């Protein structure tokens, strides 16, 4: 059985050991995965691709759905089968919520929750433990610091963690239990990290967290934080990853509308449902009338605005009429795409206790239908840009093409000609639209 402990011998560094990190789930977890890799490099490890032979494996897990739990377990088993003598460390949200369940997976040595995730090396002893060691502390509510990214490596676009946790307690959501209550990253720590990322060549920072709009640290709210980052020399682009609709300050609108401002004209707003009855049961903090008015103001004031959303299908009590209303709201709304999620019961949430569960077959059928609608909306978004001239940030070439995103988050594919233009701002002419991207022709770019 797993043992609980809070006292460990520190890890003795050994040169040139190999470590492998696999991060699952959301953009916030991806951001923390980069930090984990940086800490391993600082400790003297060589980072190798997941699946290659390794002395240490770190699996950074997700628990947002039952499927995420299953994927996490499968990933752990895949690593331990490939590396039976390696030390296996499982961190993240699945470790926080279901530590003992994780510890029962064959081959797991350490199970470390979110409070201590980024300090996991402090808990490793020189020898593999006889039984899994579980470290799952209560998550503090105070503002936090992470420290500089150090040896972390970045490409042209990088995630910048500014916030963690959530107080909204929607009836379906496990994240407040996995991530704790809302808290913000200390401004000076955040600013120093952003500066170092820019010095490493990052041109676009993507703000990440659980509930970004609740940011509040050192007298700075979300808007003041945006303004502070926007003043950084060398930062070309600033993008908000996802933000709760009731926390969006409309003072952002003129900043997004200004083509010379770093803040990009892009909003990903997780509506979760397009039906008032379902929104109320979810304990969301708005209704359709409020959201319709907000979106009309946003699109009227921000040219070329891209609005994405999340929609959950099969929430307890959702009728065919409720689902039809959600589809209508999405199709008629200003959305460019939706991420569609099939509702998954999470133990400990109010929704999981409902006697009104929708049969899984119906959930999957509805999800498939809404995904088809989303594909159609995305294609409309793509075709609506054909023939336009737009600004992009060229990323590393792959398969003979640069991939890039416009300011409003349209993905484009540009032939690599000339070469050596990665990480430059360029002008492209949008050509033929495809479901996943648009072809584009390069006609101007900044000098090196």
Stretches with model-predicted labels:
Residues 170, 190, 207, 240, ...:
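Conserved, mostly hydrophobic/aromatic
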Residues 107, 257-264, 332-336:
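Glycine-enriched alpha-helix->loop->beta-strand junction motifs that scaffold or abut catalytic
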Residues 6-7, 20, 353-448:
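Terminal RNA-binding accessory module
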């Amino acid at each position: 059985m797993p043992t609980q402990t809070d006292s460990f011998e520190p890890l003795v560094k050994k040169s040139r050991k190999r470590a492998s990190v696999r991060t699952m789930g959301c953009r916030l977890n991806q951001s923390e995965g980069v930090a984990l890799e940086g800490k391993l490099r600082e400790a003297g490890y060589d980072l190798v691709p997941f699946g290659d032979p390794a002395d240490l494996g770190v699996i950074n897990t997700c628990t947002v759905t039952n499927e995420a739990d299953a994927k996490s377990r499968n990933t752990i088993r895949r690593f331990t089968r490939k590396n039976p003598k390696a030390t296996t460390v499982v961190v993240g949200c699945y470790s926080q919520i279901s530590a003992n369940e994780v510890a029962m997976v064959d081959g797991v040595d350490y199970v470390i929750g979110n409070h201590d995730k980024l300090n996991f090396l402090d808990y490793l002893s020189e020898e593999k433990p006889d039984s899994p060691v579980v470290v799952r502390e209560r998550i503090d509510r105070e503002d936090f610091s992470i420290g500089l990214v150090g040896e972390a490596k970045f490409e042209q676009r990088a995630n910048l963690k500014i916030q963690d946790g959530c107080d909204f307690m929607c009836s379906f959501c496990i994240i407040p239990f996995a991530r704790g209550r809302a808290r913000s990253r200390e401004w000076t720590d955040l600013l120093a990290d952003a500066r170092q990322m820019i010095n490493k060549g990052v041109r676009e920072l993507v703000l990440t967290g659980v509930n970004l709009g609740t940011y509040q640290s050192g007298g700075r709210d979300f808007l003041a934080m945006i303004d502070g980052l926007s003043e950084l020399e060398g930062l070309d682009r600033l993008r908000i990853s996802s933000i709760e609709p009731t926390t969006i300050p409309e003072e952002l609108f003129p900043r997004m509308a200004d083509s010379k401002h770093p803040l990009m004209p892009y909003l990903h707003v997780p509506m979760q449902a397009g039906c008032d009855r379902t929104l109320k049961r979810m304990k969301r903090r708005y209704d359709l009338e409020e959201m319709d008015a907000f979106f009309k103001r946003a699109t009227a004031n921000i040219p070329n605005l891209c609005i994405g959303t999340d929609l959950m299908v099969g929430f307890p009590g959702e009728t065919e009429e409720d689902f039809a209303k959600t589809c209508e709201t999405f199709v008629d709304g200003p959305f460019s795409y939706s991420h569609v999620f099939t509702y998954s019961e999470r133990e400990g949430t109010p929704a999981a206790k409902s006697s009104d569960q929708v049969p899984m077959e119906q959930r999957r059928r509805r999800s498939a239908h809404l995904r088809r609608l989303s594909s159609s909306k995305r294609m409309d978004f793509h075709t609506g840009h054909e023939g336009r001239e737009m600004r992009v940030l060229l990323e590393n070439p792959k398969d003979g093409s640069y991939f890039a995103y416009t300011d409003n988050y349209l993905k484009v594919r540009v032939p690599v000609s000339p070469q050596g233009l990665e990480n430059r701002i360029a002008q492209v002419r949008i050509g033929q639209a495809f479901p996943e991207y648009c072809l584009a022709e390069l006609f101007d770019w900044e000098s090196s």
